[in-house]
Amino acid sequence: MMTSNSYWQRLKVAFQYVMPQIYLTQIAGWFAKQKWGKITHFVIKAFAKKYNIDMSIAQKEQFSDYASFNEFFIRPLKENARPINQNPTALCLPADGRISECGHIDDNLLLQAKGHFFSLEDLLAEDKELVETFKNGEFVTTYLSPRDYHRVHMPCDATLRKMIYVPGDLFSVNPFLAQHVPNLFARNERVICVFDTEFGTMVQILVGATITASIGTTWAGVINPPRHNEVKTWTYEGESAVKLLKGQEMGWFQLGSTVINLFQANQVRLADHLSVNEPVRMGEILAYKK
């Protein structure tokens, strides 16, 4: 017999399939960029109160300092608010949030949530070279809730070699949906960034979600919108190669989402403190060089 709790859970999942994800996201994006003075400041204040956001670490502490909700949402933090671990053999977490999942890639399968797996082929848009690169490697998935700092940083010194935009759905990526929507991260819109590092090839994926109005990178600006119906690839070779330092900002979300890191086999050992649903901060240790 179905309980009222399981009924509502099924209803929430069903709603994700039928709601107009892109239109809702476009509407949210339009509202988020409006500059409505006191109305905007009131909305920001209410949002900060609801999610218990610590404004003391923001460069601009006053709600009235933000002209739009988007400006507030990607607010930069004060210097040293997130110290970067300086151990040269360690990689750092790229974002504030919670660990959604982490661990070993079993041949080409990654754990999404208990009982749910997804493949490297699906996640990496069937890029055969990348799939082979990360078979039997390691992965970490970090979920950024609405209350978190939404700029994304580099785990280590790196050189950008490729960026891939993959169109897709815009399901919510909160932990509940991760447990109930199969192939969630591999079906959502995402931006895949491929780096050369002293820890081997590393991928950092910025995954879109419902109400995530845009994803941007520091070298290319806003990637979406506009949204495209086909995979787009940019390569960065020779003089066009982009070099980034450990802890340096590399991108942002305008509203919450997820970051997935992939590492090659036998290159890194994930930090012992990483565990599912564990709150983490950008700059803390993610992994060590093997």
UniProtKB/Swiss-Prot annotation:
The modification Pyruvic acid (Ser) is found at S257. This is Phosphatidylserine decarboxylase proenzyme. NCBIfam families: PS_decarb. The active site is at D96 (charge relay system), H153 (charge relay system), S257 (charge relay system), S257 (schiff-base intermediate with substrate). One of its GO terms (biological process) is phosphatidylethanolamine biosynthetic process. Catalyzes the formation of phosphatidylethanolamine (PtdEtn) from phosphatidylserine (PtdSer). Heterodimer of a large membrane-associated beta subunit and a small pyruvoyl-containing alpha subunit. GO terms for molecular function: phosphatidylserine decarboxylase activity.
